[in-house]
Amino acid sequence: SIHKIVRGENFADDPGLFNISGKKFNIPGYKMPKCKNAAGLFSENAMDIIDLFIGSEGILGVITEVEIGLAPKHASISVVKFFDTEIEAIDFTAYLKDSKDVMPDFIEYFNGSGLEMIREKAKKDPQSVSMPKISDNANAALFFDIEIKDNNINAAFNKLLSLNVDWKGSWCAWENIEKERIKNFRHALPETVNEYIAGVKKKHPSIHKLGTDFAVSDEKFGELVEFYDSVLNRSGLKYVSFGHIGDNHLHINFLPSNYDELEKGKEIYKVIAEKVIELNGSVSAEHGIGKLKHRYLEMMYGAEGVREMRRIKSVFDPHFLLNRGNMFPCGEL
């Protein structure tokens, strides 16, 4: 059957019951974490049915057409601030998020080992990076944008200066060509990680990328960062950390040089996932569960939570034909 789903037209009623084209069913009976989350099917009291389909990884139907609304693009200043230590960058993130004046559009983070990888790439192939030199003393960095309101660039700069921090060595851009150079910096690290893994695969063909996608609430982020540092530093494994720190969502990318290190990385991944779940966080804040993270979805929601997702799938796909193996193993309800 074909359903036209328009936001604002179909909500779950008080007991949590949906009725769409004669199909009646209750929303999933589990609570979602209070943080950025893309793990499993969305569920919330009085939810709009469109949110059940968004992020459902294709297990409920085939989306044939999407109509979206776009917010006007605003002028902005791009900033990269470097720090002597990673903890200074993390503390400054909290400071930025609490600011009533600056209110950045986003905040991205890069740890010390990540900056070192970019430095090495810039030395070997300066044109591929196309950005200013990173200070040798920098051990962490934040990248963020702030809006230029009413074309008043001076007012935007004054907001930055009101933060009363040392901006020495920072990068700042408002013209498009310079902002592109800063965007190159943003993408340089994940691209360099991919190049590293590709190089290792030449000797060890079954090596693959291993990275986390975890997130927690504001209140739990400091505890998770301390846990990251403790577990990762003890491991002796090479890794980089970067990502969406404004959402308490960092990607830890392991950089194995052989199969033993890859297996050790997988063990550490599981240990960190258990901690994230203990902190009521998400095992997949952005990329979804797919076919490889079934066990972590069940760890997060429990076996009953996964059964609830299967129940919802059976309403729209009773023979379990769509995207078999996505989110949970194949098989009927």
Named regions from a protein language model:
Residues 54-56, 62-266, 279:
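C-terminal substrate-recognition/cap domain of FAD-linked oxidoreductases
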Residues 1-98:
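FAD-binding subdomain of flavoenzyme oxidoreductases
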Residues 277-289, 314, 318-322:
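Alpha-helix capping/hinge segments and adjacent helical runs
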Residues 35-53, 232, 266-280:
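Short, hydrophobic/aliphatic alpha-helical segments
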Residues 253-260, 292, 296-300:
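Conserved PLP-binding active-site segment of the aspartate aminotransferase-like
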Residues 181, 289-294:
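Short, highly charged C-terminal tails/helix-capping segments
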Residues 294-333:
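Activity-critical C-terminal alpha-helical subdomain
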